[in-house]
Amino acid sequence: MATTTPNYGWPVPTSTDYVKDGATAIEALGDAIDATVFGLPSAGLTLVKTQTIGSAVSSVTVTSAFSATYDAYKIIISGGASSSNTCVLQMTLGSTATGYRAAIWEVNYTAGSAVTGQNNTAFWNFGLGVPEGLSAIGDISLPFASDQTTFSSTAVAMGLAGGNMLTRWMNGFLGDTTSYTAFTITPSAGTLTGGTIKVYGYKA
């Protein structure tokens, strides 16, 4: 007599079932698995692109990052190093070099905190870089759609002189209706070596 699996209740034959009923048993099991998998939640992150940063580069362009498949993306920059003691990792979408706006909250563990802004600049402040590593974790919404693009990111500069640490939170938008597929990361000073840029798409 057929039994069922303990977790999903899929029908499976037992060792005493007739061999002649094997095809029917496999069909029933396949239908049950298909129904379960089809009903599983689809939300989550899917890796879209991994871009390795070269040696002593002045910018990194990530192509085929955005498409109609996803409305929102997570971008993570990690590893590697900056030749500058502290640099800002600036982001531009496509070839657009104007219209970027953002609010920036910065905490320096020895110098206190500050709030600044970007109004119609040539880039977003997206992350930070120091010789000890590159840092940025951010979300971008609607870069491919013909709508304004918004972003939110955080970054930490580790190992600054005297054991100091710098943290930034950045939020902003680009108020055009251009559809973008690529973005570029440029250090505000010096060059970048090593590390990766990973782009994930948010499933609906």
Tell me what each language-model feature is:
Residues T3-P13:
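Short, contiguous pre-domain boundary segments
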Residues A2-T4, D17, D21, G30-A204:
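Surface-exposed molecular-recognition determinants
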Residues I26:
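Charged, flexible cofactor/metal-binding loops and thiol motifs
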